[in-house]
Structure formats: structure tokens, C-alpha cells
Curated annotation (Swiss-Prot):
Gene label: ccsA
Organism field: Prochlorococcus marinus (strain MIT 9303)
Keyword Thylakoid: yes
Listed GO MF terms: heme binding; heme transmembrane transporter activity
Protein's UniProt name: Cytochrome c biogenesis protein CcsA
Compartments where located: Cellular thylakoid membrane
NCBIfam families from the UniProt entry: cytochr_II_ccsB
Length: 318
């Protein structure tokens, strides 16, 4: 799928938009091994943050240039939407790192943006990478409102879900019990260690370093997913209004609409377990990780099928 000939790579370098995409790919590719090295060494993640910030600036320049070339908001085909999603993921990562500057955050979040840029640059055929005129139905101000909000919601949900995945790796044999809301300061929590690790004389032992890091990741994932869920809700509502204006129907059970609703329900279940049932740690993290699969099916799977109003086209046939 990712086979790219030397001639195709040379042609990409000749197109400034595609060249900027390759530059962002190189920066993110460099950031990932450094972030994992910093996780193992416990070093500061400033270098990775700088690389991700540079990648975000490059992607910004790419989107602005494509906007200027095409004359419309650059989110009308699969290549543009993938680059926009990568831009939103890097922005979400930078915002999260303002709350917790940790190499674990970089190691968890950076691969998502890299995969988006890699898929856009190396997997898609040239016909799906080129700018094309908008079809009449997309020539609406709702394009920017609806699609950009949906893409930003995916970015926040994916970054939050990958942080939840990091919770699964850092929460070694510990179960976090929520004593107050994770939103804000995080409240008070305690750790129940595995039975084999409990000293009957000492009772409950607390590992302050591991617990603190896991707590922070757990709280950050909760807050990030909450923001993503609100954006997804806004995106679905704006999409329904747009659909009613364009086709006279609020909801048509298009494959993308159906999977977007499933995605909304998965993350609604995640927030319900956190807010109403008081879950934290591993159990809600597993729900968030399941959400990653649903987003991939909703965003990429529908396009592979090439059916429905939201499909960018079946790129295997391009």
C-alpha cells in the first residue's frame, strides 16, 4: 500500500503542497524515536515538543497554500482531510503538553499525526492528492463549520484515547479510585496494589511517582476526550442542519452518519462511566481504546467502501 516509486517521490518534491507534507512527515518521524528514548531515560520532552510544533507550522503552511491554490477551504478530499487531521492532532498534542510536559504524552500522541501524514503522502494515488473543484453541494459556508469541527473532534478524541492507552501501560497492577472529578485538579485518589505486592504489616502502599504520572495521564485523557465529545456533538448537529438545507432531510442513515453516531455513543458511554459510575484508570481506558477503532472505521473505512454521500472515493480504484 505504501509503495512509492522514486519518480513519484520526485514529483511530490516538485509540488510545494506535497513537499510540505513530506517535510511534516520527516519532522514527526524524527520526533517518535526521540520521544520513546526520552520515556526510557526519563528526560524532558522539550526537543520532541519543538519538532511537533515545527510540524504543526509546516502543516499550517501546507493547508494555507492549498487553500490559496484551490480557492476553497482545504478539506474537500481525503488527502486534504488527512493533512488537516494531522494538523489538528499536533495542535491538540501541543495544548495537552501545556498541562503535562511529559515524554509519555509525546510518545502516545505523536504516532497518530505521523500515520495521518504517512497515509496521505504515500498511500493515496495522485488523483486523490490533487486539488479539485467543489461539487455544488459542498459550496456552502457549512463546509468549514461542519467538517472542520468534526476533524477537530476526531483529533481530540484520538489524542485523548491514545493517552488512555498510555494509562494502560503506566498503571501497572494499580486500580485508581475516583474520589472527585478528574476535571480540574484531579481530586484525591488512592491506589490498590496487587495482592502479592501488599505487605500485611504496612497495609496499603502508595507509589507516589507511578501514581502521580498515571493520575495525570488519566485526568488529561478524560478532559481531552470531553472536549472531543463536545466538538463531535456540535459537528453532528451542524451536519444535520446542513443536510436539511441541502437535501431536505436531517438524517439519512448514510454509512458515515451511522458510524459517526456509533462513535458518539461509544464516547458517551466512556463519559458516563467516568461521570456517573465513578470509573477511572484501566476500565474507561479500554472503552476509549475501543473508540479508536470506531473512529478509524468511520473516517477511513467508509472511504474504502466508496459508498454514501460522505465518501471521498474508493482510492483502490483511483
Amino acid at each position: 500500500m505504501f509503495g512509492v516509486t522514486l519518480a513519484e517521490l520526485s514529483a511530490s518534491l516538485g509540488d510545494p503542497v506535497l513537499a510540505l507534507g513530506l517535510a511534516a512527515f520527516a519532522l514527526l518521524l524524527l520526533a517518535i524515536p526521540i520521544s520513546f528514548w526520552m520515556v526510557s531515560g526519563g528526560s524532558n520532552s522539550a526537543v520532541v515538543t519543538l519538532l511537533v510544533a515545527l510540524a504543526n507550522l509546516v502543516l499550517t503552511a501546507q493547508l494555507v497554500l492549498r487553500w490559496w491554490q484551490s480557492g476553497h477551504f482545504p478539506i474537500s478530499n481525503l488527502y486534504e482531510s488527512l493533512c488537516f487531521l494531522a494538523w489538528a492532532c499536533t495542535l491538540a498534542q501541543l495544548l495537552v503538553e501545556r498541562s503535562l510536559s511529559s515524554p509519555i504524552v509525546s510518545a502516545a500522541a505523536t504516532p497518530m499525526a505521523l500515520l495521518c501524514v504517512a497515509f496521505a503522502s504515500f498511500a493515496l494515488p495522485e488523483t486523490l492528492q490533487e486539488a479539485s473543484p467543489l461539487v455544488p453541494a459542498l459550496r456552502s459556508s457549512w463546509l468549514v463549520m461542519h467538517v472542520s469541527v468534526i476533524m477537530c473532534s476526531y483529533a481530540a478524541l484520538l489524542v485523548g484515547s491514545f493517552l488512555s492507552m498510555a494509562v494502560l501501560f503506566t498503571d501497572r497492577q494499580q486500580t485508581l479510585e475516583l474520589r472527585s472529578s478528574s476535571i480540574g485538579t484531579g481530586g484525591f485518589r488512592q491506589a490498590k496494589l496487587a495482592t502479592s505486592a501488599i505487605d500485611q504489616n504496612d497495609g496499603l502502599r502508595l507509589s507516589s511517582i507511578n501514581l502521580s504520572r498515571t493520575e495525570q495521564l488519566d485526568s488529561l485523557s478524560y478532559r481531552t476526550i470531553t472536549v472531543g465529545f463536545l466538538l463531535l456533538t456540535l459537528g453532528l448537529i451542524s451536519g444535520a442542519v446542513w443536510a436539511n438545507e441541502a437535501w431536505g432531510s436531517w438524517w439519512s442513515w448514510d454509512p458515515k452518519e451511522t458510524w459517526a453516531l456509533i462513535c458518539w455513543m461509544v464516547y458517551a458511554a466512556y463519559l458516563h462511566t467516568r461521570f456517573s459510575r465513578g470509573w477511572s484508570g484501566r476500565r474507561p481506558a479500554l472503552v476509549a481504546v475501543a473508540g479508536i477503532v470506531v473512529i478509524v472505521v468511520c473516517y477511513i473505512g467508509v472511504n474504502l467502501l466508496g459508498i454514501g454521500l460522505h465518501s471521498y472515493g474508493w482510492f483502490f480504484e483511483a
